C-alpha cells in the first residue's frame, strides 16, 4: 500500500503510520520475557518472578517503548521510500478517529527541507576593503606598545628619570593612590569607603566627579565633593542617589614611557635588539592582522549578498533547534565568566529568533552553493590553512599536530576552508568594488561586527 504524504503548507507534511497490533504485541512479549530474567521482586529469587506478574507491572512501560521504537523505524522507512528530506524532528500523535482493532494508527507531522533558489551571482554587490600598512601604522602600534610598558615614578622623587616636573599636583595621566569615605545622608554605605585605592586619572575608570576631585591635589591634601550616582548605576542601593565624599590623596606618580631602543626591541622578542628588524616584524604582524580583518569583513559582505539574491522558505523546526543551540552557547559563556548557576539561567529562546533564522537560512544557501559548484574543502586546502595559522606560534609543528589530533578542531578548519571557497567563488562572479581604508577604520569595523 502506497504511503500518502499530505501537504499541510509550504514545508509542513503529514503521513499516517500504521502498526499491526499483533506485530507490536509480539515485540512486547519478547521484551517482557527478556526483562523477567533480571527482575527482582520481594519473595522471589532473581529471574524466578512469574511472567504474569512481570507483565502486570511493566506492560505499560514496555508497550510505550515498543511503540516509540516501531513508530520511529516506520517513519524512517516511509521517509526513505518517499524521498522525503526531513528537517528537524517529527511529532507523532495517535490517530484516534481511525483506530482499528488490528492496528495502531499515528500521524507524523514534520517539515521538509526547502528548495533553494540562488539568483544570478553577477547581480551581487560586494565592497572589498583593502588597507596598506605604512610607517604611520607602525608608529601608532609602537606608541600602544610603549603605553603597555609604562612605568610610574613618584612626583618629587629624584633619580634616573627626574621628578616629572616641578608641579607635584595630580594631573591627567598620573597614577594616584587615595583613601576615600562616602556617605549618603550621613550614613556610610557598602563600597563607599576604601584605603590605598589606585587608579589612573583620565582613563575613565572612575565617575567624572571623582576624577575631577582628585585632579590638582598634592600628597596629603583632601577634598570634599558631592557625587550623584547614575540612575542605571550597577550598585542598585545607591543608583540615582547623591553621596558626600571625602578623598585624601596619598601618592601621585607620573607616567614614564620607555624609550624605543635596543632594550625595548628585545622586550618585543627581537633578540639582537635591531630596531629595523623590530619595525619589520611589527609590519608583518599588522599585515597579517589586516588580512584577517579584511577577510572577515568581505566574508560578511558575501554572506549578506547571497541572502539578498536567494529565495527559500526556512523550516521552523531548524530555527527552533538553532535557538536552543544559541541559548546553550549563551549559558556556557555565562559559566565561563563565573556566573553562578549559569547552566540553568532563564534565557528566553525568543531573543535569538532573528539570529537563528539568519544562521539557518545562510546554512541552507551555502550548502546548496557548495553542492552545486563543488566547493567542498580539499585535504590539501585544510593543511595549507593549518600551516598558515601555525606560523604565528613559536612551535608551528606542535600547532599542526594539535589540530590533526582532534577531529572537532579539524572540522572547524574544514568549515573555514569551505567558507573561503564560497567567498572566492562569489567574488569571481559578483560586482566587486575595492575600497581603501585605514588600519584603524578596519579594526573599528571588525570590532563592531
Curated annotation (Swiss-Prot):
Residue ranges of domain PPIase FKBP-type in the record: 173-258
GO molecular function term, any single one: peptidyl-prolyl cis-trans isomerase activity
The enzyme's E.C. designation: 5.2.1.8
InterPro entries attached to this UniProt entry: PPIase_dom_sf (IPR046357), PPIase_FKBP_dom (IPR001179), Trig_fac (IPR005215), Trigger_fac_C (IPR008880), Trigger_fac_C_sf (IPR037041), Trigger_fac_ribosome-bd_bac (IPR008881), Trigger_fac_ribosome-bd_sf (IPR036611), Trigger_fact/SurA_dom_sf (IPR027304)
Any matching Pfam family: FKBP_C
KW Lyase (keyword) present: no
Enzyme class: isomerase
This protein's UniProt keywords: Cell cycle, Cell division, Chaperone, Cytoplasm, Isomerase, Rotamase
UniProt record similarity statement: Belongs to the FKBP-type PPIase family. Tig subfamily.
NCBIfam families assigned: tig
Domain notes: Consists of 3 domains; the N-terminus binds the ribosome, the middle domain has PPIase activity, while the C-terminus has intrinsic chaperone activity on its own.
The protein's name in its UniProt record: Trigger factor
Annotated source species: Burkholderia mallei (strain ATCC 23344)
